[in-house]
Amino acid sequence: MAHKKGASSTRNGRDSNAQRLGVKRFGGQAVNAGEILVRQRGTHFHPGTGVGRGGDDTLFALAAGAVQFGTHRGRKVVNIVPLAV
C-alpha cells in the first residue's frame, strides 16, 4: 500500500446537489388542489386549513383557493382560503 497519494490525486472534489427547498407559492397567490406550497426539512411551516403534509414534510394544497400565511398558537401555519366565486 502506498503511503503517499499519487500525482494529481485528491481526497476532496465532492459536492452534493442543492435540495431546492423553500416556499413555492406565496401569500395571496391562487393555487389548485395538489400544488406544492412549501418544500422543507422538518416542520418550519405547519399545515393549516386546506393544506396537507407529505412524508418529507412538504406542504401541498388540498383544495383550490388563495395561499395565506399566519400563526396559530405560536407556530407558523399555511392555510388555503377559498376564492370568492
UniProtKB/Swiss-Prot annotation:
Pfam families: Ribosomal_L27. Residues 1-22 are annotated as: Disordered. GO terms for biological process: translation. GO terms for molecular function: structural constituent of ribosome. Residues 7-19 have a biased composition (Polar residues). One of its GO terms (cellular component) is cytosolic large ribosomal subunit. The keyword Ribosomal protein applies. Keywords: Ribonucleoprotein, Ribosomal protein. The keyword Ribosomal protein applies. NCBIfam families: L27. Belongs to the bacterial ribosomal protein bL27 family. PANTHER family: LARGE RIBOSOMAL SUBUNIT PROTEIN BL27M, RIBOSOMAL PROTEIN L27. This is Large ribosomal subunit protein bL27.
